[in-house]
Amino acid sequence: MAQEPLATKGNFLHIYDFIVEKGREDEFIKLFEEFDYSDGNPMHKSSAQVKDGVLCRDTENPQRFFLIAEWADIVEHARIRKILAEEIKPAFVGLIEGRKFVPKYVEVVSSTPEEILNAAQPAE
């Protein structure tokens, strides 16, 4: 299987970094998945989303989570995030300490070109 960069140069990642209330981590994951996989998630309907997000859990602190996804347009992501925060209000956000669910945006400034990744593959 060919290697693939995590993201493409020129796009953006949103990185949410948050702490879930102690003892409610499994409930948080369940509520997150219920919302994320539903038709009610407007993020999945945006053409600006390049790669769907992944929810990650810190290996040293089980209360700490990260949500990372690739977007072509962070202005569009911020617009949809505002709708989530002010109108939809997903239940999983209620389990985040401080109820703060705001990402850090970062630009992808380097991504290994496909021809270099392909050349690095072992012969079959």
Placement of each model-derived feature along the sequence:
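Structured catalytic/translocation cores of nucleotide/phosphate-coupled proteins
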Residues: 13-14, 44, 64, 82
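An amphipathic, aromatic/His-enriched active-site/gating alpha helix that lines ligand/cofactor pockets
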Residues: 34-51, 70-106
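Glyoxalase I/VOC metalloenzyme domain signal
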Residues: 23, 61, 72-76
